[in-house]
Every structure is written in structure tokens, then in C-alpha cells.
Amino acid sequence: MGVKGLLFSIVLINLSLLGLCGYPRKPVDVPFWKNYEPSWASHHIKYLSGGSTVDLVLDRSSGAGFQSKKSYLFGHFSMKLKLVGGDSAGVVTAFYLSSNNAEHDEIDFEFLGNRTGQPYILQTNVFTGGKGDREQRIYLWFDPTKGYHSYSVLWNTFQIVIFVDDVPIRAFKNSKDLGVKFPFNQPMKIYSSLWDADDWATRGGLEKTDWSNAPFTASYTSFHVDGCEAATPQEVQVCNTKGMRWWDQKAFQDLDALQYRRLRWVRQKYTIYNYCTDRKRYPTLPPECTKDRDI
């Protein structure tokens, strides 16, 4: 190989490394079928524009759900949702990541419907090693039924960040040094579902689903997945190799100054419940609540 050939090979290697680390790919709009498949009640799922948009439908007989075809350990996952409009009390739309075992890990978006004119509540939760009870609830700063908005999760070995339209609404930091489990080794699939939860979803179950408004429809598009596929112990080991992917890089190990300002804005203006400030429930705060300046 001549000098020119050697230089060309070096350039190719460097370009391939850039694909692995340093530069996150922007969300790519891909059809539903590329990454997802129905998980239950497929007859209540509608496919529009060749699968670029998908509607989940809830009526008295059933809701519906879908899941990713593959499992992932770390990455960036997003989709755009338009929630059920009108009187949606009792109706829950969920977008979450979860492993499939007893001591499971899970990262939740749960959109809790409400009476007409009353705002949606977005509840997030993080389960590690089977332990959850880390609820946070916010109002959104827009009407999520009028158009599509992006909801995403960044998950690496340092933190889990939950975003709404690129605004961080929650950061769950790795607090393993404080004895708090963190999702390192259990690959998770991505799920979404629409179902009736009027026993708890709206005002603790006081507001019931008004079935005269059925069918209820939640609409999805932009099914973006950029994660490390992990179906075997060997693949889990590869995904845990730090520095291999863009989400391992320094820029993604913590929020930047602008993201912290945006998170504080959400906390001050829109947060209505945070388990880390619930002294009645937790007279002694959970360890992870004392660690980070964003809590």
C-alpha cells in the first residue's frame, strides 16, 4: 500500500470512529415497521401514510400497544405523539423502556388524561432493580393534543435524561456510589400503549372514563431509535464498553448550563409533584435525591 492509500485508510478509520462517538445523530423519521411491531390488540392499531404515522385506538373492548423488535442497552430513543383530545379523563398514554424480568429496570412517560379544559399531567418514573416509587409529575407548557411533540430518553452509564421537545424535564444520575442501583446490565425494549386506567389516572380515580366520547385515539410519528442492540451477554459486554458510542462522550455525561437552566424552569413553573420533596412520604430522602443540583 502506498502513502496515498495509507492516508486514505486512516481517513476512513477516523470517519468510522466519528460514527461511533462524539457526534449524535439527529432523530431520523422512519416508518413504524422499521423498529416496532404490535404487542397487543393489533386490530386497534391504524397505519397511515405507509406506516409513517400510527394511531392507537381505545374503546370499551380494548386499548392497544406496540413494542420495539429489539432490545437495547443505552442510547437515544424518541417518538412524536399527539395525545387524545377532548375529555380524556381516565385514559393513559404511555411511552416507556423496560427490561423483562422480576427485578426489572424501567423508564416511564405516562400521560394522564383529564376533563375537557383541564391540562394533561405527565408522570415520569424510573425503576432500577425492581424498585420504582420515583414519580415526578408536571404540566406541559403547551396543549399536547393540538399537534405532535417530541418525547425522548437519553440513557448512558452516567445518567438518564428525559426530554420534551429537547427540554430536559428530568435527570436521574448514576448514584451507584450511594448504594442506588442504576440500569447497567439489563437490555430494555421500547413500549407504548393506550389503555383505560380510570381507577387511578385522573384525580386518583375520582374522575371516570366517559365512554360516550370513545373511541379515543393517540397518534404517533417519527419512530427514532439510536441504541446499542443487546440480545446476548456478549452484546451486553460490548454495549458496556465505555467510549464506543457518542452518548459516552463528555458532552453527554452531564447536562450543560443551558439544559440546567431549562430543567430549573420546568421545576419552578410546571412541576406539581416530586418524590424528592415529599417529606411525608419520605421523611428521610432517598439517597439519589441528595446528590444532584438539578433535584
From Swiss-Prot:
- Record bears the keyword Phosphoprotein: no
Where would you find this protein in the cell? Secreted, Cell wall; Secreted, Extracellular space, Apoplast
Catalyses which reaction? breaks a beta-(1->4) bond in the backbone of a xyloglucan and transfers the xyloglucanyl segment on to O-4 of the non-reducing terminal glucose residue of an acceptor, which can be a xyloglucan or an oligosaccharide of xyloglucan
Keywords linked to the UniProt accession: Apoplast, Cell wall, Cell wall biogenesis/degradation, Disulfide bond, Glycoprotein, Glycosidase, Hydrolase, Secreted, Signal, Transferase
Signal sequence span is: 1-21
**Superkingdom field:** Eukaryota
Pfam families to which the protein is assigned, alphabetical: Glyco_hydro_16, XET_C
CDD domains, per database record: GH16_XET
Keyword Cell wall biogenesis/degradation annotated: yes
**Binding of xyloglucan, residues:** E110, Q123, T124, N125, D133, R134, E135, D199, W200, G204, R281
Example GO BP:
xyloglucan metabolic process
Record-listed E.C. numbers: 2.4.1.207
Q: Which residues form the active site?
A: E106 (nucleophile), E110 (proton donor)
Which part of the chain is the GH16 domain? 22-220
Homology family = Belongs to the glycosyl hydrolase 16 family. XTH group 1 subfamily.
PANTHER family (alphabetical): XYLOGLUCAN ENDOTRANSGLUCOSYLASE/HYDROLASE PROTEIN 8-RELATED
Protein purpose: Catalyzes xyloglucan endohydrolysis (XEH) and/or endotransglycosylation (XET). Cleaves and religates xyloglucan polymers, an essential constituent of the primary cell wall, and thereby participates in cell wall construction of growing tissues.
Name the record gives this protein: Probable xyloglucan endotransglucosylase/hydrolase protein
The organism encoding this protein is: Nicotiana tabacum (Common tobacco)
